[in-house]
C-alpha cells in the first residue's frame, strides 16, 4: 500500500521525535540536570540553524542527524606565529593570540600560520538546552561549543567534536565551560583539537558531570612533537565540583587532567591508556579524589601535586571515604604504569552532603569503558 507523501513525512517526523531522547541520567555533581526537558525536538539542517537554536532563549532539544562542518564558514587568517616546541613537521605551532608569542615565547622561532577562523571561538549554548546526536551521525567539525556567561541546565550527549585547527595552539577548544552551572557532558567524542579537548575556565562552572566520553589524543601535530596531544583536560574554575566518570582518555601527553584554582574533582572508573607524558597535574587549589580507575601504559600518572590528592591507596585507608562519600573508595588498577599514591584526607569533607557518583571496582572500568565510551555507544 502506498501512502500519500505528506502522510509519509508526518510518520517520519513522529518516528524521529519519539526515538530521540536523553539516555540515562547524570550521576554525581550534576545530578538532576534536565537540559531542554520535554521541549519538542528540532533538527537543524544548516550551521546557521544549529547556532541559532543553541543560543536562543527557549528550552530546546537540538538533535544532530549529520555532520555540521564549520570549516571555511568564517574565512581563514594567515599571519606570523611561533614554534615554541620545535620546527619538525609534527610539532604544533602557536598562533600569536593576544600577543602570546611576543610576550611569553620571545625566543621561539617565528612561523607562518594559516588557520580557520571558525575554530577559534565555539558555538554558544544558553540555558535549558539538550544537544544530542542521533546514532553515530551527530558531528560538529571545525568548531567547538561554549557553555558560558551564566548558562545553566545543559546536557550534551552522543555527539563528536573534531578537527579544530589541530596544527595550532590557540586554534580552538572542543568544549569550554565558564561561569555556568549544572552541565552534563555524556558520550561525547573529541578528536584532533588545536588546544583543549575540555576546559573549565577561571570563573565558576559550579556543578559538572563528564561521563562516558572519549578524549582521543591521536593527532598529526602535538606540542610534544610525537603525535600525542598535550592539551587534554583543564579544570581551573574558582568554585567547581566536577564528576569525571567512565571516560576513556587515550593517547595524550599531558594535562589529562590539570586541576587547580578551587576545583573538587571526583575521578571515578575512568580508563587512561597510552599516555606518553603525564596524566594528572594538580596545582594549588586542586582537590582530587581518584578511585576505581585504570592506568594502562601511563609512565607518569602524576607530574605535579601542589594541591590535595586521595588516590584510594588500599582497602584499610579507603574506609575513610564512607563517612564523606557514603561508600568505601575503590582502589585503582595499574598496568605498565608509574606510581600513584597519596592519602590526603582533609578535603574529603567537601563531598559531604553532595551528590556523589557511585564507584565500581577498577576491573569493571577495565572491561567496559573502552567499548562504551564516546559517541554512538549509548
Curated annotation (Swiss-Prot):
> Signal peptide span per the entry?
1-19
Which Enzyme Commission number(s) are listed?
4.2.2.10
Q: Which reaction does it catalyse?
A: Eliminative cleavage of (1->4)-alpha-D-galacturonan methyl ester to give oligosaccharides with 4-deoxy-6-O-methyl-alpha-D-galact-4-enuronosyl groups at their non-reducing ends
Which spans are transmembrane here?
none
Give a yes or no for keyword Lyase in this entry.
yes
Asked whether the keyword Cell cycle is assigned, the reply is: no
Instruction: Give an example GO cellular component term for this record.
Output: extracellular region
- Got any disulfides in this one, which pairs? 82-101, 91-225, 321-329
Q: Which InterPro entries has this protein been placed in?
A: Pec_lyase, Pectin_lyas_fold, Pectin_lyase_fold/virulence, PEL
Q: Where is the active site?
A: 255
- Coarsely, its chief localization is secreted
Q: Which UniProt keywords apply?
A: Carbohydrate metabolism, Cell wall biogenesis/degradation, Disulfide bond, Lyase, Polysaccharide degradation, Secreted, Signal
**Where, per UniProt, does this protein localize?**
Secreted
Taxonomy, superkingdom: Eukaryota
Per the record, the GO terms for biological process are: cell wall organization; pectin catabolic process
Picking any one GO molecular function of the record gives: pectate lyase activity
Describe the task this protein carries out: Pectinolytic enzymes consist of four classes of enzymes: pectin lyase, polygalacturonase, pectin methylesterase and rhamnogalacturonase. Among pectinolytic enzymes, pectin lyase is the most important in depolymerization of pectin, since it cleaves internal glycosidic bonds of highly methylated pectins.
**Which family does the record claim for this protein?**
Belongs to the polysaccharide lyase 1 family.
- State the name under which the record lists this protein: Probable pectin lyase A
Provide the species name. Answer: Aspergillus terreus (strain NIH 2624 / FGSC A1156)
Amino acid at each position: 500500500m502506498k501512502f500519500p507523501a505528506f502522510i509519509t513525512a508526518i510518520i517520519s517526523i513522529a518516528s524521529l521525535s519519539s526515538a530521540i531522547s536523553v539516555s540515562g541520567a547524570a550521576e554525581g555533581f550534576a545530578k538532576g540536570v534536565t537540559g531542554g526537558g520535554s521541549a519538542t525536538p528540532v533538527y537543524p539542517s544548516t550551521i546557521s540553524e544549529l547556532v541559532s537554536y543553541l543560543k536562543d532563549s527557549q528550552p530546546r532539544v537540538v538533535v544532530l542527524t549529520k555532520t555540521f562542518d564549520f570549516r571555511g564558514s568564517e574565512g581563514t587568517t594567515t599571519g606570523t606565529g611561533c614554534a615554541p616546541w620545535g620546527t619538525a613537521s609534527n610539532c604544533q605551532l602557536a598562533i600569536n593570540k593576544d600577543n602570546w608569542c611576543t610576550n611569553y615565547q620571545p625566543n621561539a622561532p617565528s612561523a607562518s600560520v594559516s588557520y580557520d577562523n571558525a575554530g577559534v571561538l565555539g558555538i554558544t549554548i544558553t540555558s535549558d538546552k539538550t544537544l544530542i546526536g542521533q546514532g553515530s551521525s551527530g558531528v560538529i567539525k571545525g568548531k567547538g561549543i561554549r557553555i558560558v556567561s551564566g548558562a545553566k541546565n545543559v546536557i550534551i550527549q552522543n555527539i563528536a567534536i573534531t578537527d579544530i585547527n589541530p596544527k595550532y595552539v590557540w586554534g580552538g577548544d572542543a568544549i569550554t565551560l565558564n561561569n555556568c552551572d549544572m552541565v552534563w557532558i555524556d558520550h561525547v567524542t573529541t578528536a584532533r583539537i588545536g588546544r583543549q579537548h575540555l576546559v573549565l575556565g577561571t570563573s565558576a562552572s559550579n556543578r559538572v558531570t563528564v561521563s562516558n566520553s572519549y578524549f582521543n589524543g591521536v593527532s598529526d601535530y602535538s606540542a610534544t612533537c610525537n603525535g600525542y596531544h598535550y592539551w587534554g583536560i583543564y579544570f581551573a574554575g574558582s568554585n567547581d565540583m566536577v564528576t569525571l566518570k567512565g571516560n576513556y582518555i587515550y593517547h595524550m601527553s599531558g594535562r589529562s587532567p590539570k586541576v587547580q584554582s578551587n576545583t573538587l574533582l571526583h575521578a571515578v572508573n575512568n580508563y587512561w591508556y597510552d599516555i606518553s607524558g603525564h596524566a594528572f597535574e594538580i596545582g594549588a587549589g586542586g582537590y582530587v579524589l581518584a578511585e576505581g580507575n585504570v592506568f594502562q601504559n601511563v609512565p607518569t600518572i602524576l607530574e605535579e601535586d601542589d594541591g590535595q590528592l586521595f588516590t584510594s591507596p588500599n582497602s584499610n585507608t579507603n574506609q575513610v571515604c564512607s563517612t564523606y562519600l557514603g561508600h568505601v573508595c575503590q582502589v585503582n588498577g595499574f598496568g605498565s604504569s608509574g606510581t600513584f599514591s597519596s592519602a590526603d584526607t582533609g578535603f574529603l569533607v567537601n563531598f559531604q552532603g553532595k551528590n556523589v557518583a557511585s564507584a565500581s571496582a577498577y576491573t569493571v572500568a577495565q572491561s567496559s569503558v573502552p567499548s562504551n565510551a564516546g559517541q554512538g555507544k549509548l
